[in-house]
Amino acid sequence: MNSEYNEWLGKTEVFHEQISEVNAKRLHHTLTQNGNPPSSGEAVFPLFLLTLGEPSVPPNQLGEDGHPKRGSFMPPIPLKRRMFAGAEYEFHRALRVGDEVKTTWNITDITRKNGSSGELVFINILREFHVRETLCATENRNIVFTDSDPKIRELNDPEESGEWMEEMSTNPLQLFRYSALTFNCHRIHYDRAYATEVEGYPGLVVHGPLLATWLSLFVSRKSGRKLKKFRFRAKRPVFDLHHFNLTGDLSGNDAAKLRVLDHQLQLAVTAEAEFVPQ
């Protein structure tokens, strides 16, 4: 941890909101899921929690990139680019449509490093989701800040698909709707001019949490099992310009290993799922 940001360690925020039938339906259709969306009293899928507990600030408190300005909850890190590097989840009790959810944010670690791409600052945030006094889920979120510009990476040998595989694609409308439902104003996901001309990406960036959500639904569908734990790590960005693949394999009786491969079969996201024992 860097002493410059000591006062932000342990900083907390709390949000209260109800899981509405309307938002459950909107996310269901945004993700193009099969079947009917959940109605009042029915369980939502585990990573629905990514739509909960996001900060809401007036437009004049947003930075150029669309995130809330730094210096309040997040420390005033001067590095220009922010990325969702990964997260770990543990699910204790299903969230349901109609639940009144309390989401607590807590900054648990701040680390500064110097890598091949320059200075990096990593922030770990613990989020806890309670319904009344019951802890329903936890998320350990990893955010990284950097000044480095996106680089054209050398291609590695193509990754081989696992036992399960599905080809997918997305588009600006779907990315915009997911941004809206998660109240994520980061412009790299819906503002093509900003993404390409300011941040230097070739296209719109597919949200890391959206890719993780697709993987979590994919493994639940393929295995027929309920999730106990899920973790993912972003390795390289995926863009709206090309298709990508979800792939995975069982790993023992109660786990699976998962990946997102881009259109060139390069590793974009890794993930692991642990199932509720049968």
Question: What are these model-derived regions, one by one?
Answer:
Residues 1-12, 84-170, 238-241, 245-278:
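HotDog/MaoC-like acyl-thioester-processing domains
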Residues 55, 146, 183, 237:
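Residues that form or immediately flank small-molecule/cofactor binding pockets and catalytic motifs
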Residues 2-43, 157-211, 218:
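A contiguous, surface-exposed recognition patch within enzymatic or periplasmic domains that forms
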Residues 1-100:
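Hydrophobic, proline/glycine-rich low-complexity stretches
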Residues 43-48, 64-75, 148-164, 186-189:
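Charged, low-complexity, helix/coiled-coil-prone segments
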Residues 61-71, 89, 140-141, 171-182, ...:
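Phosphate-binding glycine-rich loops and adjacent basic patches that engage nucleotide phosphates
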